[in-house]
């Protein structure tokens, strides 16, 4: 199975399943970067004792079940397998030829329907207009959010920001009452979304594009001081503004009833590995030795630029060690050019096959090395194909001599390293 955009296959499969998506109350998120963060903010704030808040985000970080959660708890493996067996049988018996992502999306919808979730926070997989998640009727979407849009997946979405924006804005369908877009987007992007909203009668809110002293102003709760929240990276402020714009709309229209203190308390507890995530990485099963790392799933040009802003703020001009793997087919220049300097070291590796995504594989480290040398980014390059050996080799360097270690380039790399780390904790 590979990536095949379109709604015809999943529409037929869901019909055979009884159309569970038509009973869900949804918040739908599209964009290039920041979608997962917005989803995490939304699901965290919406959680109440009596509420079931479903969240569907991809790709998964450690296990495929991580993609489908209720109140941040992954779908039980047995439940996941039972729904998948049902879907695969329908897919085969009706010769639908659904993709892996379409099957995963249907699994989420069926689970959320069975559990009777009060809200479902749904992240677009790729693009928006023809993404499997867009099978949800517009009338079921309480509001939509669009994060920062930049060049990525050009072979599927188009080669210009305007083309890509039209695909992302496709989640705004007939019946969607309200949409929030990140105000730091290019004017051309915002204009595309404005035109889409105007054509379909969806009210549009453009978030503040300035930092403004790390404040977020809302109609429902007044101002929030973000200095009191654990937000790494200024771009997370802009992601949070999208989420807060959506929550503000829900509160103003009496679709939720949450106090300002509850919002602040829940935001303060938000945590997600793989996004500017600091950890002491345990690299073997026997000793308790660890090595400190910063892990970030930056995998395209705009994400790399934001990561660099954070690194310069934290480390100044200090030399860094990057541990990197890149998904095959990615444009290397936008990712590597902002990150690498002649004073930096790069350890190139590869991730293994990704569960549930057989079309995903890593770029050959030798290919990345040749590109880095040709571009003259740095000459300090090491290739280590065995992920189990990458971080132990750095752990033997003394604390005084060890450079800060940054793992980036792919969420699949982050996920596999976390699996190794977790397996060592269990042993």
UniProtKB/Swiss-Prot annotation:
Name of the top EC class for this enzyme: ligase
GO biological process terms, semicolon-separated: folic acid-containing compound biosynthetic process; one-carbon metabolic process
Binding site for ATP: 34-37, 275, 296
Signal peptide start and end residues: none
InterPro entries: Folylpolyglutamate_synth, Folylpolyglutamate_synth_CS, Mur-like_cat_sf, Mur_ligase_C, Mur_ligase_C_dom_sf
Binding-site positions, Mg(2+) 2: 153
Catalytic activity: 7,8-dihydropteroate + L-glutamate + ATP = 7,8-dihydrofolate + ADP + phosphate + H(+)
Keyword set includes Transport: no
The keyword Translocase appears for this protein: no
The protein's annotated pathway: Cofactor biosynthesis; tetrahydrofolylpolyglutamate biosynthesis
Gene Ontology molecular functions: ATP binding; dihydrofolate synthase activity; metal ion binding; tetrahydrofolylpolyglutamate synthase activity
Enzyme Commission code(s) on record: 6.3.2.12
Keywords: ATP-binding, Cytoplasm, Ligase, Magnesium, Metal-binding, Nucleotide-binding, One-carbon metabolism
SUPFAM superfamilies xrefs: MurD-like peptide ligases, catalytic domain (SSF53623), MurD-like peptide ligases, peptide-binding domain (SSF53244)
Cell compartments where the protein resides: Cytoplasm
Further remark: Present with 2340 molecules/cell in log phase SD medium.
PANTHER family named among the record's database cross-references: DIHYDROFOLATE SYNTHETASE-RELATED, FOLYLPOLYGLUTAMATE SYNTHASE-RELATED
Similarity-based family: Belongs to the folylpolyglutamate synthase family.
Name of the protein: Dihydrofolate synthetase
Classification lineage: Eukaryota, Fungi, Dikarya, Ascomycota, Saccharomycotina
